[in-house]
């Protein structure tokens, strides 16, 4: 059952990203490295205020939906009520999501799809190297230790 739940959680993650870039990859310019963002703004593909507004309009609902889904999966679907049980489940989900984001989203989808290539920036290096992915995912792995404690606390309080 946990594998099905992890798959659902990762598909929800993907769906949220896909919705954010409806109309083209430029709508998700905030996902790109700063140098690519700056160059896209110079080319007039988007302005910085619009990009920042789109980032905020994505990130706030994204975090709310992903947090709510995680709390409901752990507390309601799995019936976890103790902090410890909820913490370990949250840590598993967050770490799997972290790896999924780095490998499936960043390396496979972004790295092998023409969708993410911006007009006028065809030669811009926007796909992370394996070294960059490992560094970012290692840092996030530590952050998710604390994030799992927050989720565990919420589940314990609600359920």
Per-segment meaning from a language model:
Residues 1-92, 96-159:
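Juxtamembrane/disordered regions of integral membrane proteins
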């Amino acid at each position: 059952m946990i594998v099905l739940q992890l798959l659902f959680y990762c598909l929800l993650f993907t769906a949220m990203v896909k919705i954010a870039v409806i109309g083209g990859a430029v709508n998700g310019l905030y996902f790109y490295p700063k140098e690519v963002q700056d160059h896209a703004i110079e080319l007039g593909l988007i302005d910085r205020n619009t990009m920042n507004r789109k980032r905020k309009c994505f990130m706030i609902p994204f975090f709310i939906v992903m947090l709510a889904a995680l709390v409901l999966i752990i507390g309601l679907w799995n019936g976890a009520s103790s902090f410890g049980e909820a913490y370990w489940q949250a840590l598993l989900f967050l770490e799997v999501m972290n790896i999924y984001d780095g490998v499936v989203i960043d390396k496979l989808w972004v790295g092998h799809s023409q969708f993410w290539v911006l007009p006028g920036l065809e030669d811009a290096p926007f796909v992370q190297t394996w070294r960059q992915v490992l560094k970012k995912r290692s840092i996030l792995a530590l952050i998710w230790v604390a994030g799992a404690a927050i989720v565990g606390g919420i589940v314990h309080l609600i359920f």
